Amino acid sequence: MRCPKCNYNKSSVVDSRQAEDGNTIRRRRECESCHTRFTTFERLEELPLLVIKKDGTREQFSRDKILNGVVQSAQKRPVSSTDIENLISRIEQKVRTAYENEVSSTVIGNLVMEELAELDEITYVRFASVYKSFKDLDEIEELLQQITNRVRGKKKSSVDDEAY
């Protein structure tokens, strides 16, 4: 594995363990030249999964596209890179389990929104505002009302649980 700092092509594995998603191996490596430590992830190569875009074109599924959208939405929020990596792994696993060769971009976008709603409401709103292409404030207000109702429902059920 090539070192990201000095580009030397030999490194040794210092630590290796299964990642939280269960489908990935996380390896800590150390460059044999400059001794920089870096992390790599190893996962099973899957058959190509095609994403059907809204205009009907098809392109290969890309974790990086989801990553870029989520990272941008999570800027300055208390969302760790591990949280984001796990979120993307869950989405990919759901898609690969439910769809054999092709999936619509709408399905992927909705899965991202479901996961973000559980992770961080502000990140969810930021992602939704781009993904849903809101046309006016009424649409944003409706989304915020849905989130408020969901949060109130969670608080009410946790209060009910404490009463027992």
Swiss-Prot record:
Keywords per UniProt: ATP-binding, DNA-binding, Metal-binding, Nucleotide-binding, Repressor, Transcription, Transcription regulation, Zinc, Zinc-finger
InterPro entries: ATP-cone_dom (IPR005144), NrdR-like_N (IPR055173), RNR_NrdR-like (IPR003796)
Superkingdom of this protein's organism: Bacteria
All residue ranges annotated as the ATP-cone domain in the record: 49-139
Cofactor section: Zn(2+)
Keyword Nuclease among record annotations: no
Pfam families: ATP-cone, Zn_ribbon_NrdR
Zinc finger (unnamed): 3-34
Single annotated GO MF: DNA binding
Cofactor binding summary note: Binds 1 zinc ion.
General function of this protein: Negatively regulates transcription of bacterial ribonucleotide reductase nrd genes and operons by binding to NrdR-boxes.
Family stated for the protein in its record: Belongs to the NrdR family.
Protein name: Transcriptional repressor NrdR
Protein encoded by which gene: nrdR
